[in-house]
Regions:
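Catalytic Walker B motif of ABC-type/P-loop ATPase nucleotide-binding domains
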Residues: 68-71
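Conserved signature/switch motifs of ABC ATPase nucleotide-binding domains
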Residues: 42, 63, 95
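Helix N-cap at the start of a conserved alpha-helix in ABC-type nucleotide-binding domains
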Residues: 79-81
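H-loop/switch region of ABC-family ATPase nucleotide-binding domains
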Residues: 103-104
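Conserved ABC ATPase signature
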Residues: 43-47, 51
Length: 153
């Protein structure tokens, strides 16, 4: 049950062997970048699901990765919290961060992606630029999925 700040500092000091002062400076910078600097001393029980997810993003960014993998980052969130996490991810994309995102948030995928891969049964069914895949999918299964999605949206 570490604070948000310690959650971002510890991986840097343990894995990267960064000096604690530098790790803290980097952690605070990234907590600020995801709108969580005011919660640096908060513990998990004091944070909403969306806030916890943003701390997790700050922790990952504190390690200064080349790529970040997001596996359904909004699936366990209340609907009200989804937007705040997607907004942080959108800013990351705009900053040039390479992200691999597994998501059912189709509007987000269409708006933010350079490349989209549609998987069906664990196999790549179709891939392409968002305009191609969402605008004129080639595979029947992709068309079926997207038509269902568009009806629900």
């Amino acid at each position: 049950n570490m604070t948000a700040l310690e959650n971002c500092v510890r991986p840097q000091t343990v894995v990267l062997k960064r000096p604690r002062a530098e790790a803290k400076r980097i952690a605070l910078e990234h907590l600020d970048s995801v709108g969580m600097s005011a919660f640096a001393n908060a513990r998990p029980s004091q944070l909403s699901g969306g806030q916890k997810q943003r701390v997790a993003i700050a922790r990952a960014l504190s390690m200064r990765p080349d790529v970040i993998l997001f596996d359904e980052p909004t699936s366990a969130l209340d609907p009200e919290m989804v937007g705040e996490v997607l907004e942080v991810m959108k800013k990351l994309a705009q900053s040039g961060m390479t992200m691999v995102v597994v998501t059912h948030e189709m509007a987000f995928a269409r708006d933010v992606s350079d490349r989209v891969i549609f998987m069906d049964g664990g196999v790549i069914a179709e891939e392409g630029a968002p305009e191609e895949l969402f605008g004129s999918p080639k595979q029947p299964r992709t068309r079926e999925f997207l038509s269902r999605y568009l009806r629900q949206a």
